[in-house]
Swiss-Prot record:
Matches recorded under Gene3D superfamilies: ARID DNA-binding domain (1.10.150.60), Cupin (2.60.120.650), Zinc/RING finger domain, C3HC4 (zinc finger) (3.30.40.10)
Protein localization: Nucleus
Domain JmjC: 476-695
More info: Present with 259 molecules/cell in log phase SD medium.
InterPro entries named among the record's database cross-references: ARID_dom, ARID_dom_sf, JmjC_dom, JmjN, Zinc_finger_PHD-type_CS, Znf_FYVE_PHD, Znf_PHD, Znf_PHD-finger
GO molecular function terms listed in the Swiss-Prot or TrEMBL record: DNA binding; zinc ion binding
Zinc finger residue extent: PHD-type: 1238-1290
Domain of life: Eukaryota
Protein name: Protein ECM5
Role noted for this protein: May be involved in cell wall organization and biogenesis.
Length: 1411
């Protein structure tokens, strides 16, 4: 597609141009129309405003970035990657004295400064001013040091500003290395040559081509370096890391099922033996040569050995020790893809697009006009990084952090002995030693792996597509002025007035790095100030050059490049010339070139230069926007008379970078930082110089200052800013008007087009300003500024005007000239009102017909956007108040003022409510809290009403985007969190409720959310007390007391569902029992003093308290118990015989042996309760008989410990009762599980905040914590599948007693033996044993009834039902071996076919249980 077609198509998509014939000398006609090029969707006022629910959180779009989401291991609620778990590294510098503390008069604050460092302000977050105001106040310091550091004293939540979802952030990294691209290629070619020679000459095998995976030649060098970094082939196989290594090789998720196998096979076949051979060779060389000789063998330069030896030592040292080149560290300037394409710059966007016939490339069946490159028309699409290729490694944040740890470990292992002081503590690194090692690596190139780094990553990587901030952060944090997403479009930033963001200035970028990740020396795009915030992880070392030394430093870079090119221009291979020549002729080398082409970013660019022949109009040198890859040793910079400053950027600190300041940064470990650019009014004095520098460097301009000034005059209400803009643009307007006059005099009539695209000169690469001349020659065209065109005009004798020898209008029409204007005359008239210089009359028409001006504005500039309030005010003040036009304007203006007041009032109310939000107390135990509906329906309705009014209002005002943003957030928030609301995860629901308090939501939302939370809270308490049978009297009385039991019951009546009626009945029964007991107590208290209270009545009261676990205060219970115990002791002292209940021993013995549940009728007489009159072993009197009885008791107690593991038995009691419960956790048929199931796993708990994993066979979800003692780590390889121990295939048979604490038969024997004891253990040991046996017996009987017929497994029983019972048994740790064995075998037979299908298809099965 030609450049002319590009312009036509873009102009047509964005807005159809309006062509006119006018007389230039008479100025622009007042009715001229402008082709407005706003890129927003309908109802979207401008790119600086928030236009959707998602962009209300992140001011970006997802249109030019695809998250690299791949098939992951099937899991529910994967264990979150918590920022708190990240091991960060800090750089520490030995202080050269105490840092000076200096008072800064403009800010009224103190800052600290050390020698060779930058000013550092340390403030609490509540003391922070507006970021741009702070920048303006410290500009005097920034102009001297280049940077200013602001360190925030961390508050309770130090990750408040972390506006990314760390679990869903995916990105492509660039591969950085410690030498130049040329030398890196030399190393790689040497590797392939050695590998080829090894296979063909040493191993005597045939190796002709490199394997291909997914239609791409495998990068063996990268594969080997990744595997070696992870510990080698065996370690990667053991840890199942092949899928991750595949991502690091840039392979996509759709082939992950076969990728691991392919990579493993390729490595074993080609590289494994080579690794062993290399290790043996290295060991042999180590015996013969010292380490320096080994290192010099790895890397040699192009000069001959003799010359290298003869070269002066000081010259070698200068290059080798002071000036270095590091691959892929270059900082890049972002530009719109289509502008780069039109201007002939290399583009990289399409090179990453997968070819698909009929989609990416048209065919005969393709509809007319279809063009894949414009599938996202109407949006700013930025070109991809030149370092992003099809082989770029893909990471999520967790995987990248793990890779950074592996890199850190590898470097420590290699250099720890040489740098003992550096790695003495892994959490802190001495700065000087850190720098020394870094520059040592640059000079010696000892590292065999790349440093994968993400530089300038678009903020769209954490966009709505991966569901980030709306679920993570309260709106008060989103609206925080120090949230970097808000800074580019801050009210004090001129970037808010951009029509078209050609350079991604209004969106933030991210850097993600590890140890020795580097961003090379660079100056900010267009000298714009920037702010960098280190969100997470380790410290960065930041170098900065003072702005006044910018030219000196650029000269140093140029000199370094010249010397580098002269001395190290042609690296030499370590492979001999004959071997290399032979290797280059092989098919293996050609296969390597195929792999190199996919990985080499220099070959991915797509150029489409749209130009005249070189002899017609000279073109300009084009650059791709990358800055230098040179690294200088700090002392070398200082020695060249350049001031260099250093600082460290820790987590939670900001670095302000000032215009013309060169900076460079190096990471000390894993970090994630964010960068934002902004344009304060003070930047305007650098804007002209920045434009010239951009043109001189051959970079594509990112903005036009003159266009920005006019937009500021049109849209800003700030009188100071408006005056500054007028002063700055006045000279340009005069010059433009004079050139317009000359053009009219020389040519007369030209075509005029109004549009807003490509106002960049093809000759100088400078912005053309408010107008441009488009010279078209056939299908080609060139843009020139009006000034450039006038200079190029020639006038031969015949009077015909020509340019470069081609007539402007000859009869053949070879050359045509068209004038394009950025603004219409009406808009210019408003913007330039007040400029009284006569030449401006050639630039605009001073026509006082404001009604016509209004019509022009409505049909051009503001056709798809709202009108700024100041323009309406201007038109009202310049028109007759008696005209209909004025009355119409004033009516709209007055309505807008009323609407503005309503919006202000609503925003103030909303902010007051949001700021008053505190942590919610949900209550505990029986003391549960009714949750308030924070925002009334009235507030949500008011917001909706305001939104409708604001949306229909045609006038733009500052409160408008806030209302739109709030409305979209309130609408989208319930949708984004629907899964949480519909689920039963109480922790997530509570967290959601807390977040919701800062959003005006409908009452229907609040009602549903609060009702669900309250119900789940109630059920959680019910399970703790009534199912797990916890003793209430041992609980905190502030949470569990009798008065609170009533409120707990009322709470349940309000919030429970119909399915909870049985549970409410149990609570009611407990209350009635309490009332009955209290009635008995009242009867005791009413008796007169002579009356006596029966001891049996007191015992009945205590028995009820124990049996029903009534929430009686422990002091009351202890006092009653004390009275009874004292009476019994008195009887003993008086030789009064206490009759023990021995009559029913034979009955209960027989019932227990027969597994008859009727034994519970007699249990209270033998379970250590009040009715069990046997003395406690702890009260042994010491008589001979008592000693014999004590001996029998101890034997029984030992037997109990052996069988029941008494201590563990007490710990698992709640889970036994919970898992053996068949009332509240009833069997749910398979077809109803998706709707009705609320309890999962062996533990039979609800879906909690911990990670869960699904069994591939039974489809049950299991908590990871419940498998292998929580040590199961689900791999991210989808080839590896989890199968629970119940579905485990026969070949992986697991001992059935795995996890069993006791067998039912053993428990029965213990109970039978306890019946004959004369001394019993302290309560509640016996009671727990009897209760557990009753539950287990009931469970066994029910299971036999449901699953067995005549002692055999019922073949009609579904495996789903059988596994339900097996699952509960395993969770209870109670063994029914004679029943579970046949049930497991039955399931294994049923599951055999499914297991076979999985294994036959290459799936790897894990159970989470050691084999």
């Amino acid at each position: 597609m030609s450049g002319h077609d590009s312009v036509t198509k873009i102009s047509h998509i964005l807005n159809e141009p309006v062509n006119e014939k006018v007389m230039v000398q008479n100025g622009f006609h007042e009715s001229s129309k402008i082709a407005d090029i706003e890129l927003e969707i309908q109802e979207r006022p401008s790119i600086k405003q928030w236009e959707s629910p998602r962009s209300a959180v992140i001011p970006t779009s997802n249109h030019n970035f695809s998250p690299f989401l791949y098939t992951q291991f099937k899991s529910r609620g994967a264990a979150p990657f918590a920022p708190e778990t990240i091991k960060s590294v800090d750089l520490v510098e030995l202080p050269e004295g105490v840092p000076a503390r200096v008072f800064h008069e403009k800010t009224g604050l103190f800052y600290q400064i050390s020698p060779h460092s930058i000013p550092t302000f340390i403030l609490a977050k509540k003391e922070l001013p507006d970021p741009i105001k702070f920048y303006e106040l410290v500009e005097d310091l920034g102009s001297v040091y280049g940077c200013v550091k602001l360190k925030i004293i961390p508050d309770a939540d130090k990750f408040t500003q972390l506006n990314v979802d760390v679990d869903r952030l995916w990105f492509k990294a660039r591969k950085q290395f410690f030498n130049s691209n040329e030398f890196q290629r030399t190393k790689i070619v040497d590797f392939y040559a050695k590998l080829y020679n090894f296979h063909n000459k040493i191993k005597k095998s045939t190796l002709t081509r490199i394997p291909s995976i997914d239609k791409r030649t495998l990068d063996l060098y990268r594969l080997r370096s990744c595997v070696k970094l992870r510990g080698g082939f065996n370690a990667v196989c053991e840890k199942k890391l092949w899928a991750q290594i595949g991502r690091e090789l840039g392979y996509s998720g759709r082939i992950m099922s076969s990728l691991s196998t392919s990579l493993r096979s390729a490595y074993a076949k080609i590289l494994l033996d080579f690794d062993i051979y290399e290790e043996e060779e290295q060991a042999a060389r180590n015996n013969e040569k010292n380490e320096d000789m080994v290192e010099s063998e790895i890397f040699r330069h192009s000069n001959s050995r003799s010359r290298d030896e003869e070269e002066p030592l000081h010259k070698k040292a200068k290059i080798h020790r002071d000036v270095f080149r590091a691959g892929s560290i270059n900082h890049e300037f972002k530009r719109m893809r289509d502008i780069k394409h039109i201007k002939g710059f290399p583009t990289y966007f399409n090179s990453l697009t997968e070819f698909k016939l009929g989609y990416t490339q048209s065919t005969e069946t393709t509809l007319p006009g279809y063009d894949f490159t414009f599938w996202e028309n109407g949006m700013e699409i930025y070109d991809k990084s030149k370092y992003e290729t099809k082989t770029s490694p893909v990471y999520n944040l967790r995987q990248y952090y793990e890779k950074s740890l592996a890199v850190f470990t590898a470097i420590v292992a290699k250099f720890g002995s040489s740098y003992p002081d550096l790695f003495a503590k892994h959490t802190t690194l001495p700065q000087k030693e850190f720098e020394r090692l870094y520059f040592h690596l640059l000079s010696e190139h000892f590292i065999d792996f790349e440093i994968d780094t993400g530089l300038g990553l678009p903020c769209s990587m954490r966009s709505p597509g991966n569901n980030s901030s709306n679920e993570k952060f309260a709106i008060k944090n989103i609206l925080d002025q120090w949230n970097l997403d808000n800074i580019p479009l801050n009210e004090l930033s001129l970037l808010q007035h951009l029509d078209l963001d050609m350079a991604n200035f209004t969106r933030t970028t991210y850097d993600i790095g590890m140890l020795f990740s580097c961003q090379g020396w660079s100056v900010s795009d267009h000298f714009l100030p920037s702010i960098d915030f280190n969100h997470l992880g380790s410290t960065k070392l930041v170098y900065s050059i003072a702005p006044k030394d910018m030219e000196k430093f650029e000269a140093l870079i140029a000199r370094g490049k010249s010397e580098w090119d002269t001395i190290q221009s042609r690296p030499r291979y370590s492979t001999s010339d004959d071997e290399l020549k032979s290797f280059i002729e092989t098919d293996f080398y050609k296969s390597f070139l195929d792999a190199e082409q996919s990985a080499d970013y220099s070959n991915t660019g797509d150029n489409s230069k749209n130009s005249f022949p070189e002899d017609k109009i000279a073109g300009n040198t084009l650059h791709d926007g990358s800055q230098s890859d040179f690294i200088f040793e700090p002392n070398f910079i200082l020695a060249n008379g350049i001031k260099l400053y250093k600082t460290t950027q820790e987590q939670g600190s900001y670095i302000f970078k000032f215009p013309k300041a060169f900076t460079c940064s190096i990471g000390s470990g894993f970090y994630l930082s964010q960068n934002a650019k902004f344009a304060p009014s003070s930047w305007l004095r650098f804007s002209s110089e920045a434009a010239k520098w951009t043109s001189k460097m051959g970079f594509l301009p990112g903005l036009d200052v003159n266009q920005l000034l006019i937009n500021a005059l049109l849209n800003s209400n700030n009188p100071v800013l408006r005056k500054k803009c007028r002063d700055l643009i006045s000279n340009y307007v005069v010059e433009e008007a004079e050139n317009s006059k000359k053009l009219g005099e020389l040519i007369g009539t030209v075509d005029v087009v109004y549009n807003k695209l490509n106002y960049i000169s093809d000759i100088s690469l400078e912005s053309t300003g408010l107008s441009k001349i488009v010279v078209t020659h056939g299908a080609l065209q060139r843009n020139l500024s009006l000034k450039e065109f006038v200079v190029l005009l020639e006038k031969p004798e015949n009077g015909a005007h020509s340019i470069c020898g081609i007539p402007i209008r000859d009869q053949s029409g070879n050359l045509n000239v068209c004038l394009h204007s950025y603004f219409d005359s009406a808009s210019l008239g408003i913007a330039l009102d007040g400029l009284d210089k006569p030449p401006t009359s050639y630039l605009l028409v001073h026509n006082e017909d404001f009604e016509k001006k209004w019509d022009v504005l409505m049909t051009s500039t503001f056709r798809n956007r709202t009108v700024p309030l100041n323009i309406i005010q201007y038109l009202i003040s310049h028109t007759d108040s008696n005209t209909e036009f004025n009355r119409m304007l004033r009516s709209n203006f007055d309505d807008s003022l009323l609407l503005i007041e309503k919006c202000k009032k609503f925003i103030k109310t909303f902010v007051d409510v949001s700021c008053s939000v505190k942590d919610v107390d949900f209550g505990n135990g029986f003391n549960l809290r009714h949750l308030p509906l924070k925002f009334s329906d009235n507030m949500a309705d008011n917001l909706e009403s305001l939104y409708e009014s604001v949306r229909k209002c045609s006038i733009e005002f500052s409160e408008k985007p806030t209302i739109i943003r709030l409305y979209h957030v309130s609408r989208q928030f319930p949708i984004d969190n629907r899964d949480i609301i519909d689920g039963n995860n109480l922790d997530l629901l509570k967290e959601l409720y807390q977040k919701s308090l800062t959003i005006p939501l409908k009452v229907s939302y609040w009602t549903k959310l609060t009702r669900k939370i309250c119900r789940l809270e109630w059920l959680s308490v019910y399970e703790h007390i009534f199912i797990e049978r916890c003793d209430i009297k041992n609980e905190d009385p502030a949470k569990y007391s009798l008065p609170l039991l009533y409120s707990y019951f009322e709470f349940g009546l309000k919030y429970c569902d119909s399915e909870d009626i049985d549970k409410l009945g149990e609570v009611r029964k407990l209350i009635l029992k309490y009332q009955d007991m209290m009635q008995k107590v009242r009867v005791f208290l009413k008796k007169d003093p002579p009356s006596k209270i029966s001891l049996s009545d007191l015992e009945d009261v205590l028995l009820d308290i124990e049996e029903y676990r009534l929430p009686i205060q422990s002091s009351f219970f202890s006092e009653l118990d004390y009275v009874i115990r004292e009476i019994e002791n008195a009887k003993k002292m008086n030789d009064v015989n206490i009759l023990y209940n021995t009559d029913n021993i034979d009955k209960i013995d027989e019932l227990i042996r027969k597994n008859d549940p009727k034994f519970v009728k007699f249990a209270n007489q033998f379970n250590g309760s009040r009715l069990d009159k046997r003395p406690l072993a702890s009260d042994n009197s010491g008589s001979v008989k008592a000693k014999q009885e004590l001996k029998v008791f101890k034997l029984w107690n030992q037997h109990l410990d052996q069988i029941m593991q008494k201590n563990k038995f007490i710990e698992i009691l709640p889970s036994i009762f919970r898992c053996l419960d068949l009332k509240s956790d009833k069997y749910i048929p398979l077809e109803s599980c998706s709707k009705r199931q609320t309890k999962y796993c062996f533990c039979r708990r609800v879906e909690e905040g911990t990670a869960m994993v699904e069994c591939e066979i039974c489809k049950e979800w299991y908590h990871v914590d419940c498998i292998s003692n929580g040590e199961l780590v689900p791999p991210d390889d989808p080839n590896v599948l989890f199968v629970c121990s119940i579905c485990t295939p026969p070949c992986m048979a697991v001992d059935n007693i795995e996890g069993v604490t006791f067998e039912l038969d053993d428990l029965k024997r213990i109970l039978v033996e306890s019946l004959k004891l004369s001394l019993i253990p302290d309560p509640p040991i016996l009671k727990n044993l009897f209760d557990v046996f009753a539950f287990a017996l009931n469970f066994k009987n029910e299971m036999e009834k449901e699953l067995f017929t005549n002692g055999y497994v019922n073949q009609l029983s579904s495996t789903h039902k059988i596994k339900y019972y097996l699952r509960k048994l395993k969770g209870s740790q109670c063994g029914f071996t004679n029943l579970t064995d046949p049930l497991r075998k039955h399931c294994q037979v049923k599951d055999a076919e499914a297991i076979k299908w999985l294994t036959d298809n290459g799936r790897i099965i894990i159970t989470g249980i050691p084999n």
